[in-house]
């Protein structure tokens, strides 16, 4: 579909707004993906508050100019699907990582890379971004560790009391 100059300008403005509000952006190559699979990916994205978009590379390059995501220019080759979230930096990476694992029948779907805090992350190192725990996950881990430490201290105190009573 041919876009007129006005629509292209609106898209560049929209991409620039995305680049200013997103915590991280993940870029993937959607070539060869069936429309049913893309629809499924969009449903999963809505559930995890991740936004998806397919944009032309020239418009993306113009939209990310003078933003922390400018280092994406080296990654933008061929068809481009971007995923981003303004709530959690790892949610888009986690979504695309899980989707690429489920697409074992389609080897064409590849995560090209990502940008987090102004630094480019290659597609092979996307796990470092995808494994960042959410606030709730981190809180759960902290509580579990705190409980284990408390239980361990209590156990040591009880053992020392038992030893003191046995020795006296």
Curated annotation (Swiss-Prot):
Function of the molecule: Forms part of the ribosomal stalk, playing a central role in the interaction of the ribosome with GTP-bound translation factors.
Family: Belongs to the universal ribosomal protein uL10 family.
InterPro entries: Ribosomal_uL10, Ribosomal_uL10-like_sf, Ribosomal_uL10_bac, Ribosomal_uL10_bac_type
Stored CDD domains: Ribosomal_L10 (cd05797)
Pfam family, one: Ribosomal_L10
Gene3D superfamilies with a match to the protein in the record: 3.30.70.1730
Annotated source species: Buchnera aphidicola subsp. Baizongia pistaciae (strain Bp)
Cystines in this chain: none
Assembly and interaction partners: Part of the ribosomal stalk of the 50S ribosomal subunit. The N-terminus interacts with L11 and the large rRNA to form the base of the stalk. The C-terminus forms an elongated spine to which L12 dimers bind in a sequential fashion forming a multimeric L10(L12)X complex.
Gene name per UniProt: rplJ
Cellular component, GO annotation: ribonucleoprotein complex; ribosome
Protein name: Large ribosomal subunit protein uL10
One Gene Ontology MF term: large ribosomal subunit rRNA binding
């Amino acid at each position: 579909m041919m876009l007129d100059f006005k629509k292209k300008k609106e898209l560049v403005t929209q991409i620039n707004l995305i680049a200013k509000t997103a915590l991280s952006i993940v870029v993937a190559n959607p070539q060869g993906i069936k429309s049913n699979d893309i629809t499924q990916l969009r449903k999963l994205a809505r559930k995890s508050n991740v936004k998806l978009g397919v944009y032309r590379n020239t418009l993306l390059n113009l939209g990310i100019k003078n933003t922390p995501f400018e280092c994406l220019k080296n990654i933008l080759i061929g068809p481009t699907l971007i995923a981003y979230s303004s709530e959690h930096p790892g949610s888009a990476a986690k979504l695309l990582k899980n989707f690429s694992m489920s697409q074992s029948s389609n080897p064409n779907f590849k995560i090209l890379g990502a940008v987090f805090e102004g630094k480019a992350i290659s597609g092979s190192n996307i796990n470092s971004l995808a494994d960042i725990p959410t606030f709730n996950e981190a809180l759960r881990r902290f509580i579990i560790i705190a409980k284990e430490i408390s239980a361990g201290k209590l156990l040591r105190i009880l053992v020392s009391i038992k030893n003191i009573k046995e020795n006296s």
